[in-house]
Amino acid sequence: METGYMQVVKSWLEGNFDEATKAQIRELQQNDPVGLEDAFYRNLEFGTGGLRGIMGVGTNRMNKYTVGMATQGLANYMKANLEGPLSVCISFDSRNNSPEFAQITANVLAANGIHVYIFDKLHPIALMSYSVRTKKANAGIMITASHNPKEYNGYKVFWSDGAQVTSPVDKDIVAEVAKITDPSMVKFEPGADAAPIEVMGHEMDEAYLNSVMTLMLSPEAVAAHKDIKIVYTPIHGSGVEIVPEFLQKLGFENIYHVPEQDVVDGNFPTVMSPNPEEPSALAMAVAVADREGADLVMATDPDADRIGIAVRDNEGKMVLLNGNQTASILTYYILRRWSELGKLDGKQYIVKTIVTTELLRAIAEKYGVKVYNVLTGFKWIADIVKKNEGETTFVCGGEESYGFNVGEFVRDKDAPISCAFVAECAAWAAAQGKTLYQLLQDIYAEFGYYKESLISVTKKGKAGLEEIAQMMVDYRQNPPKELAGSPVIKVIDYTKPEETGLPSSNVLQFYNEAGDVVTVRPSGTEPKIKFYFGIKGADADAKNEALRAQFSK
């Protein structure tokens, strides 16, 4: 008697699958039975964020069949729930198979009578979001696995506002995709009655750049300091053309590249991980900065939604800023310039996530700008923008995980515009005789020193997941009495929407008298429980050590 997954293997070997796929399955049978089981023991889950998985043959892998099935489910949902004519914009990053998966997605949508707009080559998420809004499309799809390892790819679904889908649409799409149980249910080939597939080229880039240029705040400072030396690396990803073009359009003249990392390559050969949060991913760019005497390094990940930066400290050494520090500098710069230009009238707001530094709130309060605190994930920032559209103005928003956006043209993390504002802010600081590092110290001097850190505790297997669940129960029933020696004065339980005003989420926050906050949440994607520390005060380093000891037991 064959086990369940072997029956699925047999159906792929005997079914209407291409010969290359069958050959790879036979190779796994002979040489890697464990890998074979992992590839077929379940279906790759289409979750509320779309698909993400290792590429390869099988039901539990990203391949043309699983991508086709996801697209057919999405097409079925759109046709059943939206008024026609329907259209979708598609973009893709530099990962292996991204162009092929994008083309398969386009073919399936067209075969289902849905008009497709697809980029002619790799483009950042920001351009996909912008194109959805510009073309007034019903949805958008980005083929990417963000900064995951090279073995991965993914499929993100966006809605007509250019933001990732949220409830209830996300769950309804998931349910529709789940009904597509076999590739034979997919219309892979567009027939004579197919909708058109229209290619988008540089004209969309120009439209995007012309739009976001209207948001810039200090052209005089840039003109006076156009010679500041900037090193930019796309880390083999989709920022490779648009970011340098944006910086040049702003007027910057000394943009240095890392030639090896300007090569679009889904194997990311020069880095361990294409993640701008990792110091090693910026090492080559920092070396160029040291060689050329540059004061600023900027890096973006494969889909160009996150930005990592390095700046020169007072000793002349390049130091990496974390996502909270970059968001703080940008928020301070943008709100101060809005204030100086007379653009603030009480109808502006910023958005941060609940695990992002409270320094953003302190800065916004100084300028009389409202702050929204939302759940983790940029889709919740975009959700606030959608709800306030036409009433109040979104200035900027960010999260601790290196994502930031400015203005309402794009509804997701936008690394190209983040790079532009970091560069403009550097020029503005230079006009005052300061570096970005010194500007950050000035911000701390004015608003207080804020330090953020994170610990992740891994609990493996089924027992580990049960232990994590029990830890959350224990923290709810017996919250800590003190944090780093200061009494806890407030507990927020995000499973209670009636109290938070946010969708229910398994997150707890503890605030102490000193103004520190600890956020506890299980990871949505890994067997981990995460503790985020937001610490305020001159003794932040000591308090950080105390909290790490308190919560890593």
Kindly give the residue locations of the regions a language model identified:
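Short acidic, glycine/serine/threonine-rich loops at helix termini
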Residues: P99-I104, S129-R133, E151-V157, M185, ...
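N-terminal small/polar loop signature for handling phosphorylated ligands or for N-terminal nucleophile
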Residues: C89-Y152, E253-G308
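Phosphate-binding and adjacent anionic-ligand microenvironments
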Residues: D290, A294-L296, K317, R337-R521, ...
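Gly/Ser/Thr-enriched, mixed-charge loops and adjacent short helices
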Residues: W12-N16, G35-F40, L44, N153-A281, ...
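Conserved phosphate/anionic-ligand binding catalytic regions in large, soluble enzymes, centered on
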Residues: F40-N60, S146, I230, P234-F246, ...
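An N-terminal, well-structured beta->alpha segment
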Residues: V8-T105, A195-K226, S238
